[in-house]
Amino acid sequence: MVSELELKEIIGKVLKEMAVEGKTEGQAVTETKKTSESHIEDGIIDDITKEDLREIVELKNATNKEEFLKYKRKTPARLGISRAGSRYTTHTMLRLRADHAAAQDAVLSSVNEDFLKANNLFIVKSRCEDKDQYITRPDLGRRLDEESVKTLKEKCVQNPTVQVFVADGLSSTAIEANIEDCLPALLNGLKSYGISVGTPFFAKLARVGLADDVSEVLGAEVTCVLIGERPGLATAESMSAYITYKGYVGIPEAKRTVVSNIHVKGTPAAEAGAHIAHIIKKVLDAKASGQDLKL
């Protein structure tokens, strides 16, 4: 049986050995820290949203990568993404979150007023007071407020053959990305057809149906609104043109002709402008739009 004195001696030896080992390990760690140097580079982190998903296959063991890419190039859908266990890989998750954030920004942000001035567009607005009301009350987004009605009557040509205007809709980003190329191409195209055009302007917090109110206020034969579309994970920059012949408040949606997917990976803005002008010419010739127009 170990006596109390022997037990104290054993414990003392163990503590001394632990102290020596701890000191040695601490020195080793310290030496390691001294020899390792952190390397920090100045610069800008690459924007992950600039990668073209149609050119990326994340599957590590793809049997025929080139053949799979042929399918991917035909769609913006997220095909061929990889997983870590049951979860997305870090790259895939970051891209999803980045695209979702871009979509949120497109809806909740506003078009820069300096941008509108640079494109000679004065501002009117719907009856919505803010973005929250715009999202929850679509009916108010379809009507002009009283001040805007007065502004249009003062600044715009009355009874134009075609009234073209721009609206933020659900994507302010789409307007800033496409209008500089699309609007001039559209106006020049109409001019080349000898069609008179009213005074372009910008409508804030507007829905597609606001074009009907504009048509009644200005007496336009054809109304065309270039509006930002609801963004998604594929793109936050998609714009559409809604064309209506002799629109009025309450007109059925089926009476509108639509040119959609106007963005850099869809129909290019300048090309879309020329195409819209051609469609408007057909609308005027047929005196009809929407399902009544045979293209």
UniProtKB/Swiss-Prot annotation:
GO molecular function, one term: ethanolamine ammonia-lyase activity
Origin: domain of life: Bacteria
Task performed by this protein: Catalyzes the deamination of various vicinal amino-alcohols to oxo compounds. Allows this organism to utilize ethanolamine as the sole source of nitrogen and carbon in the presence of external vitamin B12.
Catalytically driven reaction(s): ethanolamine = acetaldehyde + NH4(+)
Database matches in Pfam families: EutC (PF05985)
Protein name: Ethanolamine ammonia-lyase small subunit
Pathway(s) it belongs to: Amine and polyamine degradation; ethanolamine degradation
Binding site for adenosylcob(III)alamin: 208, 229
EC number per UniProt: 4.3.1.7
Gene this protein is translated from: eutC
Keyword DNA-binding: no
EC class name: lyase
Subcellular location: Bacterial microcompartment
